[in-house]
């Protein structure tokens, strides 16, 4: 019996299950391709934006960063930096003291990061749902196929292949199709989740660097380093006092 003949023997419920799984598979592939395109664009534009941002951190002009932000709107790093830079520039343009706007800038960075993460995670919930439910939908079709096979045996009083082939085909195809739909969705979900974690780290780093640069926050020293420096200073003062005597 060919595969086409097996499909032809599938019952109404089994056919509905397979159609549902096929539609889920098509939607899943569409979501995966869309997320891959967006993530690749975000990564590429972020790599292009980082040299401009790095130049600003080393003493470059703020206006260069603002102009570059317009060219890299799909970059997750640029989106977060844009919120902080525009907030800071708005305070400066209004004639207020920029040094007093650190809370406004950090709040804008935090809100922008949250919004960017929501955008990056869009569609992942659907992939997770498909990955977790598709095998169970296939299992439902399997159970229905086995039931149909037993009903055929009961109706004919025999258990030949021609009697149970429809039910067995329905059971096996539903199981295979459910697993086939679930595997790409789960793999893609895990892959994109890892990408988002990396993007989150990059956005956090850029936010910290921006705040430190705008407000000239000194690097925090470890307590043991501060103690050593204080002791060295005391020793130097003592030596100078002895020398003066």
Stretches found by the model and what they are:
Residues 8, 12, 18, 122-125, ...:
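Internal alpha-helical transmembrane segments of multi-pass membrane proteins, especially GPCRs
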Residues 157-171:
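Hydrophobic alpha-helical transmembrane segments and adjacent short intramembrane/lumenal linkers
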Residues 1-53:
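Hydrophobic membrane-targeting segments
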Residues 22-42, 139, 146, 181-196:
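Alpha-helical transmembrane segments
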